[in-house]
Amino acid sequence: MSIIKSVYARQILDSRGNPTIEVDVCTEQGFVGRAAVPSGASTGLHEAMELRDKDSAVYLGKGVQKAIKHVKEIIAPVLIGRSVFNQQAIDTLLIELDGTLNKARLGANAILGTSIAVAKAAAMSLNIPLYQYIGGLNAYILPTPMINIFNGGAHADNNVDIQEFMVMPIKANSFAEALRMGVEVFHQLGRILKEKGLSTNVGDEGGYASNLPSNEAAMEFILQAIEKAGYQPGEDISIALDAASTEFYQAEKEVYHFKKSTGIKLTSTELVDFWKNWVQKYPIISIEDGMAEDDWEGWHQLTQAIGSKVQLVGDDLFVTNTKRLAKGIEQNIANAVLIKMNQVGTLSETLDTVNLAKKHGYQNIISHRSGETEDSTIADLAVALNAGQIKTGSVSRTDRTAKYNQLLRIEETLGEHARFAGHPFKK
């Protein structure tokens, strides 16, 4: 039995230079579990609420001292003396302590930091990796990475509407090989942009963030980069997109406004046609948030139109929430769910969503947030849950490569038992 001796929280900085919370859970035996909580830029309306201080004189209102105080004064006293191995019971207690539907009282950041730190302390107590503690002996599948190589939307100050353009090395034989392929394409894209006199500055998630003639130009440059790296688009490497359509949806007018590029406005039906054309034209394997979070009719049309051809991922749509996912399953909307722990707020609730998705044949993609830290928990989680896919940004920022490097270590540790997921979407 490993008993919690103390729970401590501190304020650190995330990859955007904004404060976030880091929690330490220490046991009587001297083991320490430490977890840092990320933050999103394009957040879903239905996400659990992260608590910010809103004091404009300090960190422009983005401090997290209130959340830290809640950990120290409310959460810590009720966890001290409990076993770190009672994850479900501890997470349930945290939810009850908060007492709101969206964790607005204590803050999802305070709760999640504690939840993950408990799991890490438990793994440390047993002297086993986190992925093995969560997933057991069946945790051996390395995920296919969605490697972000171009940023737009809310993640970049450019004129591209679509938030993320990613490459998926589906023909790789190992995670290490997949990562190498993605790195080679990333650098080839940088060379292409430079040759054309375009900026090679990067966005929030490490992908290039140049101003381009159009959204289509990003696709064309990426195809060129794949070929220049020596690979066949659609055979060796496919393309995944995160449209983040909620960001350019005008709900009051029920139109999608491509305001950063051409300025065109599309109805839901017209946007479905837009995606149909792109799927026919380009080797796209996955589209995340192709419609806005509450455009259920648009999502239904999109799923009917191309759901048998590509992976349709709900991020803002489902927000890692079992109730939202259950509604999507009932209405046959999308076929995959993005898993972000801070959208729901505890490890146990995250696992509930993953299990519900698996039960109904939906794919799971374990994901980072745009405001990240050096914490690599999601790498372990992807392997623990045999999710098969991970989305953790580009290969040019340490907050992103920390996750990729952890997956390299895990693959090495698993040795001959490791399996690479490969092609993520098979109908």
UniProtKB/Swiss-Prot annotation:
PROSITE patterns: ENOLASE (PS00164)
TM helices/strands, residue ranges: none
Function: Catalyzes the reversible conversion of 2-phosphoglycerate (2-PG) into phosphoenolpyruvate (PEP). It is essential for the degradation of carbohydrates via glycolysis.
Active-site residues from the entry: 205 (proton donor), 340 (proton acceptor)
Catalytic reaction annotation: (2R)-2-phosphoglycerate = phosphoenolpyruvate + H2O
Family: Belongs to the enolase family.
Gene3D superfamilies reported for this sequence: Enolase-like C-terminal domain, Enolase-like, N-terminal domain
Signal peptide segment: none
Enzyme Commission number(s): 4.2.1.11
Subcellular location: Cytoplasm; Secreted; Cell surface
Pathway this chain belongs to: Carbohydrate degradation; glycolysis; pyruvate from D-glyceraldehyde 3-phosphate: step 4/5
Designated name of the protein: Enolase
Gene that this sequence comes from: eno
A molecular-function term among this protein's GO annotations: magnesium ion binding
Cofactor: Mg(2+)
One CC-aspect GO term: extracellular region
UniProt entry keywords in alphabetical sequence: Cytoplasm, Glycolysis, Lyase, Magnesium, Metal-binding, Secreted
InterPro entries the UniProt entry points to: Enolase, Enolase-like_C_sf, Enolase-like_N, Enolase_C, Enolase_CS, Enolase_N
Broad enzyme group: lyase
SUPFAM superfamilies with a match to the protein in the record: Enolase C-terminal domain-like, Enolase N-terminal domain-like
Record: residues binding Mg(2+): 242, 288, 315
Co-factor binding comment: Binds a second Mg(2+) ion via substrate during catalysis.
Positions of (2R)-2-phosphoglycerate binding: 163, 340, 369-370, 391
